[in-house]
Protein backbone atom coordinates (compact mmCIF):
# COMPACT_ATOMS: atom_id res chain seq x y z
CA UNK A 1 0.00 0.00 0.00
CA UNK A 2 1.49 3.33 -1.01
CA UNK A 3 0.67 6.70 0.42
CA UNK A 4 1.54 10.29 -0.36
CA UNK A 5 1.60 11.08 3.35
CA UNK A 6 5.02 11.10 5.03
CA UNK A 7 5.80 8.93 8.01
CA UNK A 8 6.03 12.02 10.24
CA UNK A 9 2.56 13.11 9.15
CA UNK A 10 1.18 9.64 9.87
CA UNK A 11 2.69 9.67 13.34
CA UNK A 12 1.25 13.13 14.03
CA UNK A 13 -2.14 11.99 12.76
CA UNK A 14 -2.03 8.87 14.97
CA UNK A 15 -1.09 10.90 18.05
CA UNK A 16 -3.92 13.36 17.34
CA UNK A 17 -6.36 10.46 17.04
CA UNK A 18 -5.08 8.95 20.30
CA UNK A 19 -5.56 12.34 21.99
CA UNK A 20 -9.08 12.52 20.58
CA UNK A 21 -9.87 9.03 21.92
CA UNK A 22 -8.42 9.94 25.30
CA UNK A 23 -10.43 13.18 25.52
CA UNK A 24 -13.71 11.56 24.41
CA UNK A 25 -13.18 8.82 27.00
CA UNK A 26 -12.38 11.39 29.68
CA UNK A 27 -15.68 13.11 28.88
CA UNK A 28 -17.59 9.82 28.93
CA UNK A 29 -18.71 10.43 25.33
CA UNK A 30 -19.14 6.90 24.00
CA UNK A 31 -20.12 8.01 20.47
CA UNK A 32 -17.05 10.22 20.01
CA UNK A 33 -14.80 7.68 21.69
CA UNK A 34 -15.97 4.90 19.36
CA UNK A 35 -15.62 7.21 16.34
CA UNK A 36 -12.09 8.13 17.43
CA UNK A 37 -11.19 4.48 17.96
CA UNK A 38 -12.46 3.52 14.48
CA UNK A 39 -10.45 6.37 12.91
CA UNK A 40 -7.37 5.38 14.90
CA UNK A 41 -7.84 1.73 14.01
CA UNK A 42 -8.22 2.55 10.31
CA UNK A 43 -5.24 4.92 10.35
CA UNK A 44 -2.82 2.16 11.32
CA UNK A 45 -4.25 -0.68 9.23
CA UNK A 46 -1.76 -0.27 6.42
CA UNK A 47 1.13 -0.09 8.92
CA UNK A 48 0.10 -3.49 10.26
CA UNK A 49 0.36 -4.93 6.77
CA UNK A 50 3.76 -3.32 6.19
CA UNK A 51 5.36 -4.18 9.54
CA UNK A 52 3.75 -7.19 11.13
CA UNK A 53 0.99 -8.33 8.87
CA UNK A 54 -2.54 -8.53 10.19
CA UNK A 55 -1.81 -11.07 12.90
CA UNK A 56 -3.45 -11.86 16.19
CA UNK A 57 -0.25 -10.79 17.95
CA UNK A 58 -0.27 -7.41 16.17
CA UNK A 59 -3.91 -6.93 17.19
CA UNK A 60 -3.04 -7.74 20.81
CA UNK A 61 -0.21 -5.19 20.77
CA UNK A 62 -2.55 -2.59 19.30
CA UNK A 63 -5.13 -3.44 21.97
CA UNK A 64 -2.59 -2.85 24.74
CA UNK A 65 -1.79 0.61 23.36
CA UNK A 66 -5.47 1.47 22.95
CA UNK A 67 -6.27 0.21 26.45
CA UNK A 68 -3.53 2.45 27.87
CA UNK A 69 -4.86 5.51 26.01
CA UNK A 70 -8.38 4.82 27.30
CA UNK A 71 -7.13 4.14 30.84
CA UNK A 72 -5.29 7.48 30.92
CA UNK A 73 -8.46 9.25 29.78
CA UNK A 74 -10.34 7.54 32.61
CA UNK A 75 -7.64 8.54 35.09
CA UNK A 76 -7.98 12.17 33.96
CA UNK A 77 -11.74 11.86 34.48
CA UNK A 78 -11.11 10.93 38.11
CA UNK A 79 -11.89 7.23 37.92
CA UNK A 80 -10.33 5.66 41.02
CA UNK A 81 -7.17 3.63 40.34
CA UNK A 82 -8.66 0.43 41.78
CA UNK A 83 -11.64 0.67 39.38
CA UNK A 84 -9.41 1.65 36.47
CA UNK A 85 -7.08 -1.26 37.13
CA UNK A 86 -9.95 -3.74 37.40
CA UNK A 87 -11.56 -2.67 34.12
CA UNK A 88 -8.20 -2.77 32.38
CA UNK A 89 -7.28 -6.19 33.82
CA UNK A 90 -10.58 -7.72 32.69
CA UNK A 91 -10.00 -6.36 29.19
CA UNK A 92 -6.44 -7.63 29.15
CA UNK A 93 -7.65 -11.14 30.00
CA UNK A 94 -10.32 -11.02 27.28
CA UNK A 95 -7.72 -9.90 24.73
CA UNK A 96 -5.24 -12.56 25.82
CA UNK A 97 -7.90 -15.27 25.42
CA UNK A 98 -9.24 -13.98 22.09
CA UNK A 99 -9.05 -16.37 19.16
CA UNK A 100 -9.60 -13.84 16.38
CA UNK A 101 -8.98 -10.23 15.45
CA UNK A 102 -12.75 -9.69 15.40
CA UNK A 103 -12.96 -10.76 19.06
CA UNK A 104 -10.22 -8.25 19.90
CA UNK A 105 -12.03 -5.49 18.02
CA UNK A 106 -15.27 -6.35 19.84
CA UNK A 107 -13.39 -6.06 23.13
CA UNK A 108 -12.19 -2.57 22.15
CA UNK A 109 -15.83 -1.52 21.76
CA UNK A 110 -16.91 -3.18 25.01
CA UNK A 111 -14.03 -1.54 26.87
CA UNK A 112 -14.82 1.92 25.51
CA UNK A 113 -18.50 1.52 26.44
CA UNK A 114 -17.68 0.33 29.96
CA UNK A 115 -15.23 3.15 30.64
CA UNK A 116 -17.58 5.81 29.26
CA UNK A 117 -20.48 4.44 31.32
CA UNK A 118 -18.33 4.47 34.47
CA UNK A 119 -17.16 8.03 33.76
CA UNK A 120 -20.70 9.28 33.07
CA UNK A 121 -21.87 7.71 36.32
CA UNK A 122 -19.08 9.49 38.20
CA UNK A 123 -19.97 12.82 36.60
CA UNK A 124 -23.70 12.55 37.24
CA UNK A 125 -23.63 11.17 40.77
CA UNK A 126 -21.08 13.44 42.39
CA UNK A 127 -19.95 10.55 44.58
CA UNK A 128 -16.45 10.37 45.98
CA UNK A 129 -13.87 8.03 44.49
CA UNK A 130 -14.35 5.66 47.43
CA UNK A 131 -18.11 5.41 46.91
CA UNK A 132 -17.71 4.96 43.15
CA UNK A 133 -15.16 2.21 43.81
CA UNK A 134 -17.52 0.53 46.30
CA UNK A 135 -20.44 0.69 43.85
CA UNK A 136 -18.26 -0.72 41.08
CA UNK A 137 -17.07 -3.50 43.40
CA UNK A 138 -20.65 -4.40 44.30
CA UNK A 139 -21.78 -4.39 40.67
CA UNK A 140 -18.95 -6.61 39.51
CA UNK A 141 -18.78 -8.99 42.47
CA UNK A 142 -22.41 -10.08 42.53
CA UNK A 143 -21.48 -13.72 41.81
CA UNK A 144 -19.24 -13.86 44.89
CA UNK A 145 -19.95 -13.70 48.59
CA UNK A 146 -19.33 -10.00 49.29
CA UNK A 147 -18.63 -8.73 52.78
CA UNK A 148 -17.90 -5.23 54.00
CA UNK A 149 -14.55 -6.51 55.27
CA UNK A 150 -13.56 -7.89 51.85
CA UNK A 151 -14.68 -4.71 50.12
CA UNK A 152 -12.81 -2.54 52.64
CA UNK A 153 -9.67 -4.64 52.17
CA UNK A 154 -9.91 -4.30 48.39
CA UNK A 155 -10.40 -0.53 48.66
CA UNK A 156 -7.73 -0.17 51.37
CA UNK A 157 -9.92 1.54 53.97
CA UNK A 158 -11.37 0.47 57.29
CA UNK A 159 -14.81 -1.17 57.23
CA UNK A 160 -16.21 1.54 59.54
CA UNK A 161 -14.96 4.34 57.29
CA UNK A 162 -16.34 2.62 54.19
CA UNK A 163 -19.77 2.18 55.78
CA UNK A 164 -19.88 5.76 57.09
CA UNK A 165 -18.78 7.36 53.80
CA UNK A 166 -21.08 5.20 51.68
CA UNK A 167 -24.08 5.90 53.94
CA UNK A 168 -23.31 9.63 53.95
CA UNK A 169 -23.31 9.79 50.13
CA UNK A 170 -25.83 7.12 49.10
CA UNK A 171 -28.15 7.13 52.11
CA UNK A 172 -27.80 3.41 52.86
CA UNK A 173 -25.01 1.08 53.91
CA UNK A 174 -23.22 -0.87 51.17
CA UNK A 175 -24.54 -4.25 52.42
Question: Which residues fall in each region the model found?
Answer:
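Hydrophobic residues on short alpha-helical segments
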Residues: 22, 132-139
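Hydrophobic, helix-rich cores of sensory/ligand-binding and other regulatory modules
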Residues: 1-115
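Basic/polar phosphate-binding segments, predominantly the helix-turn-helix DNA-binding elements
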Residues: 122, 139-141, 145-175
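Sequence-level signature for long, low-complexity tracts enriched in small/hydrophobic residues
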Residues: 116-123
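N-terminal positioning helix adjacent to the helix-turn-helix/winged-helix DNA-binding module
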Residues: 126-134, 170
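Generic structural marker for isolated residues within well-ordered, non-membrane alpha-helices
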Residues: 70, 91, 135, 148, ...
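Short acidic alpha-helical/loop segments enriched in Asp/Glu that coordinate divalent cations
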Residues: 81-86, 126, 147-149
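Residue-level marker of regulatory loop/turn positions in helix-turn-helix DNA-binding domains and
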Residues: 13, 55, 123, 127, ...
